[in-house]
Amino acid sequence: MWKDLILEIKDILESVNYKLNTPATDTEVQRLREHAKEKLNVDLPSEYVEFLKTVNSLDFDGLVLYGVDSFLLETEKGEQICGFIEMNEIWYENEFQKEYLFFGDSNIAWFCKNLSEGTYHELDKPSGTVMNTYDDFKTMLEEALKITLL
């Protein structure tokens, strides 16, 4: 389902002469996994890895989904990428946010995983109040994309 939404976004972008970012390679994803483990002490969800292998970061209509950081890429692609490691390090400057792993944000929300509960949340930005809870990354991703396409 989320892949269909990505295709819809792709069509919209192409209609105004923009493109989706290219997919991350296996090597790039592996580098991200290693850095996430080393710097953030987390394993990446398989659904997030699948997203990265479809499109490495997405910036569309106020929704930004993080990708493999530029310093982990095999080659410079000239694409706008909000890096997963970089963005989590920024959000972790606020102590209460260290309980979350951030995958993206919008003008009004963060999309993240509660590390102690294992649940996925849409948090109000900037208060951090839970607006929605999801059982898995895939469902959270689909809802974020649907909202953006409204």
Segments predicted by a language model, with ranges:
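Compact, glycine/acidic-enriched structural inserts
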Residues: 130-143, 148
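A surface-exposed partner-binding patch
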Residues: 1-110
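Short, well-ordered, mixed-charge alpha-helical segments that flank or form enzyme active sites
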Residues: 110-112, 130
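Short acidic-glycine loop/turn motifs at beta-strand connectors
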Residues: 114-117
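Intrinsically disordered, low-complexity regulatory segments enriched in Ser/Thr/Pro
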Residues: 119-124
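Hydrophobic/aromatic-lined pockets within catalytic cores
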Residues: 53-56, 145, 149
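Short, solvent-exposed aromatic-acidic interface loops
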Residues: 126-128
